[in-house]
Amino acid sequence: MAAFGQKSGEPQPLGGAWEGGWRSGEIVLSMIADHTRAAWSAKVRETLFVDGLRLARPVRSTDGRYVVSGWRADTFVSGEPEPRHDEVVSAGVRLHEATATLERPRFLTQTPVPPWTDVDVFTVADRAAWDDRPLQALPLGAPELPQSEDRERSVELVTQLAGLRKPTKSPSQLVHGDLYGAVLFTGTAAPGITDITPYWRPAS
């Protein structure tokens, strides 16, 4: 807390939308899963303006860093995740209009290597979902599940679903890959967004 200029106090735990973060006054402290992604998100959110959305802004440490010893700090945005599906989609459209001009981060082009992290698992799953041959998308060194009926059924379903996909004509751009986990609602206030989980995919 002191690294981000916060005085000692009794922080309050928050939910999954804040990655299990802790609120101290108007600041939320959260542990990060990936330093590079956390710093990128903070840098983007620091200056990004999206009409009709409340973005959590990064709070830099006393020496100017976005991440300190695996922690980041952001301004608190009130609200809770709610099943307002149309509003989440609308928020995504507005956000992606604003992120359309952002360059592709280098880390989104890198292939995961052992030892794998949770972020790597999602990265590989994303690439498999878009690959022409999803089951061939796993890089060398990927952990394998033991043979089981569930695994065989999963492979069968993936193969079926892959055959139902249709090509998209929309260009790839910087998109938020976890809107339902990061969009907050409170009354009639504009939707809030706690973080940006970056992917390079078509926005529609």
Pin down the residues of each PLM region.
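Regulatory N- and C-terminal appendages and interdomain linkers associated
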Residues: 1-12, 33-36, 40-43, 47-51, ...
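Hydrophobic, well-ordered secondary-structure segments
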Residues: 85-92, 155-158, 176
